[in-house]
């Protein structure tokens, strides 16, 4: 048999996948630390007991208790909720449901969360960027100029990694610009730290609005991989066509339902209050640290700061087992590091290490 046209496994792969740079998650980047402040996780574990032991049967496609509990918590109808393997799956589902590969585009505004780009590239959908303004708010004129052919617009509010909320009037303008043209996805992964800013009350007014949520941050369940998509019923029904039949395992659904009980939600709110208190402590200390040029306002469980020599600071702390997130390569974030709010002991270790840095 001729081997002249034999292809390697890599050659058999789709070209866009061969060229794809995967999302650089905190775990993928690695490190050998004992102070992990690079993934915006809650710093201590929460405990749950598994109550559902029927593991020989497939789980529900959309577990009823999880959907109903989340709908009640979010103030929407159960028909407006879809649960998935983290909010990341929600990103992918929206792109798959609304974008034709090779024809349509998504649009997002860097610096922002990297999975919008990676998901689109994986699916073969064009990516358009309209960089945020100097104050990291939306460039509405730039978005308007690039809307033709864009089916989905992603906006992260509060924004990761900058930490600020997007101006609500700008969000309204964006929703009016895109009405009848594109889906607007508001990523609210960090909304528990500023719940007054949620857009859930806008769903009735804007049928093309989709909201992403997660249990990974304030609910302290990053290891569970459980996220939610909130939208009008018509959108949810479309997403149900493209989601895998059993996205949540039985143990995940069991723990998620417990986390969304009244007791679980009260515990989450206590964690948020604790985090906000620690955030203020960390901000105050950073502002009095010589190697820190600027500390940006944050509505989240992390802080973005600009350093005089960020690369050497990052490596120095890395070598001491303190793992932060380097944001130098993000547009307009030269010299910036992102620091997750940790325990008081962890936060103090960061400050002590930074104050020992040469200036």
From Swiss-Prot:
Top-level taxonomic group: Bacteria
Gene Ontology biological process terms in this record: L-histidine biosynthetic process
Transmembrane parts of this sequence: none
Keyword terms of this UniProt record: Amino-acid biosynthesis, Aminotransferase, Histidine biosynthesis, Pyridoxal phosphate, Transferase
MF term (GO), any: histidinol-phosphate transaminase activity
Annotated EC: 2.6.1.9
Class of this enzyme: transferase
Needed cofactors: pyridoxal 5'-phosphate
N6-(pyridoxal phosphate)lysine sites (modified residues): 217
Reactions listed under catalytic activity: L-histidinol phosphate + 2-oxoglutarate = 3-(imidazol-4-yl)-2-oxopropyl phosphate + L-glutamate
Known pathway: Amino-acid biosynthesis; L-histidine biosynthesis; L-histidine from 5-phospho-alpha-D-ribose 1-diphosphate: step 7/9
Disulfide bonds: none
UniProt key word Aminoacyl-tRNA synthetase: no
Family label: Belongs to the class-II pyridoxal-phosphate-dependent aminotransferase family. Histidinol-phosphate aminotransferase subfamily.
NCBIfam families, per the entry: hisC
Self-association and partners: Homodimer.
Protein name stated in the entry: Histidinol-phosphate aminotransferase
Organism: Salmonella paratyphi B (strain ATCC BAA-1250 / SPB7)
Higher taxonomy: Bacteria, Pseudomonadati, Pseudomonadota, Gammaproteobacteria, Enterobacterales
């Amino acid at each position: 048999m001729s081997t002249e046209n034999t292809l390697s496994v890599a050659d058999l792969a789709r070209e866009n996948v061969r060229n794809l740079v995967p999302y650089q998650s905190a775990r993928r980047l690695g490190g050998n630390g004992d102070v992990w402040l690079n993934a915006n996780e809650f710093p201590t574990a929460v405990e749950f007991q598994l109550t559902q032991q029927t593991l020989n049967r497939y789980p529900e496609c959309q577990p009823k208790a999880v959907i109903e509990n989340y709908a009640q918590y979010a103030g929407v109808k159960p028909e407006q909720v879809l649960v998935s393997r983290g909010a990341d799956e929600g990103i992918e589902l929206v792109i798959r449901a609304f974008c034709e590969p090779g024809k349509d585009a998504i649009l997002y505004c860097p610096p922002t969360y990297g999975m919008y780009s990676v998901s689109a590239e994986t699916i073969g959908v064009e990516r358009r960027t309209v960089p945020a303004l100097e104050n990291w708010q939306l460039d509405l004129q730039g978005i308007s100029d690039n809307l033709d052919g864009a089916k989905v617009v992603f906006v992260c509010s509060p924004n990761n990694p900058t930490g600020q909320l997007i101006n609500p009037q700008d969000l309204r303008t964006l929703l009016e610009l895109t009405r009848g043209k594109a889906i607007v996805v508001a990523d609210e992964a960090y909304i528990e730290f500023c719940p007054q800013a949620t857009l859930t009350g806008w769903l009735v007014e804007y049928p093309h609005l989709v909201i992403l949520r997660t249990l990974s941050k304030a609910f302290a369940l990053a290891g569970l991989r459980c996220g939610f998509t909130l939208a009008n019923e018509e959108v949810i029904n479309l997403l149900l066509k493209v989601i895998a039949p059993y996205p949540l395992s039985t143990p995940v659904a069991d723990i998620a339902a417990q986390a969304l009980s009244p007791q679980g939600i009260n515990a989450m709110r206590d964690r948020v209050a604790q985090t906000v208190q620690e955030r203020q402590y960390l901000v105050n200390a950073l502002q009095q640290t010589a190697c820190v040029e600027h500390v940006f306002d944050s509505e989240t469980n992390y802080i973005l700061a600009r350093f005089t020599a960020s690369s050497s600071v990052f490596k120095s702390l890395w070598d001491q087992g303190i793992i932060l997130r380097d944001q130098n390569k993000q547009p307009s974030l030269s010299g910036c590091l992102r620091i997750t709010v940790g325990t008081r002991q962890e936060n103090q270790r960061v400050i002590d290490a930074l104050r020992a840095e040469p200036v």
